[in-house]
């Protein structure tokens, strides 16, 4: 889903040519099972991503909320049964109590699985942050979202993108008045590489720790409009307390 805030001048979209590499946007096909914490949220179709943080809990974006979700793990090609998948239904879905669907502040959600998953080489957890990552840190973004800035091409194979954490000043300048201290920007101010619709809820992993959740942006891969992500390091206590209480 990545909450898409449409450009006012959609008709002028052709004035922004972007070099589409036919991936996440501008990314590459991940090596199979190289992102074992990546999950697909399914309600008869893939609609969002998420990250496995222990054998019974997944973290995603609150704007991905549905009352019933099947979590699919161990996936590479989401349209083919490859034999390594685990499909588990949700038992509890818990949005952050202060999630604001208008501003997308606190865009984080926890999903308790109906039963623990089997951890192996293809299904593994990602660590929560021990501290907030500084600007310039290189991160990996992944998902099965749209691979085009203009038009739609939803890939079968998991897509990856290497991108840096941007300075908060650049993030705020890109989206004046819209960036809270619970949001970070990751990507490229020049455009061309970004997450997109369908990547929502998925991971931004930096040095082995989950630092971001795909949240929103103006369009995808547009100049001066980098992707905006939930700042996971602000929520470690909430995550741990919520899991302990449930």
From Swiss-Prot:
Which residues does the entry assign to the active site, renumbered to this chain? 63 (charge relay system), 107 (charge relay system), 200 (charge relay system)
Q: Where is the Peptidase S1 domain?
A: 24-244
Gene3D superfamilies, alphabetically?
Answer: Trypsin-like serine proteases
Reaction equation(s) it catalyzes: Preferential cleavage: Arg-|-Xaa, Lys-|-Xaa
Keywords associated with the record: Autocatalytic cleavage, Calcium, Disulfide bond, Hydrolase, Metal-binding, Protease, Secreted, Serine protease, Signal, Zymogen
Q: Which residues form the signal peptide?
A: 1-15
Record's comment on post-translational modification: Proteolytically cleaved and activated by an autocatalytic mechanism. Cleavage by CTRC inhibits autoactivation.
For the ligand (Ca(2+)), the binding residues are 75, 77, 80, 82, 85
Cofactor(s) required for function per UniProt:
Ca(2+)
Q: Could you tell me in which tissues this protein is expressed?
A: Expressed in the pancreas, lung and kidney.
The compartments listed are: Secreted, Extracellular space
Top EC category = hydrolase
The EC number of this protein is 3.4.21.4
Cofactor note text? Binds 1 Ca(2+) ion per subunit.
Query: Any chance you could tell me the propeptide residue ranges?
Result: 16-23
Site features described as Cleavage, chain residue numbers: 81-82, 122-123, 150-151, 193-194
Query: Biological process (GO) annotations?
Result: proteolysis
> What does the activity regulation annotation say?
Activated by autocatalytic cleavage. Cleavage by CTRC inhibits autoactivation.
**UniProt cross-references to Pfam families, sorted A to Z:** Trypsin
Q: Which GO terms describe its molecular function?
A: metal ion binding; serine-type endopeptidase activity
Q: What is the recorded function of this protein according to its Swiss-Prot or TrEMBL entry?
A: Serine protease capable of autoactivation.
Name of the molecule in the record:
Trypsin-4
Q: Which organism is it from?
A: Mus musculus
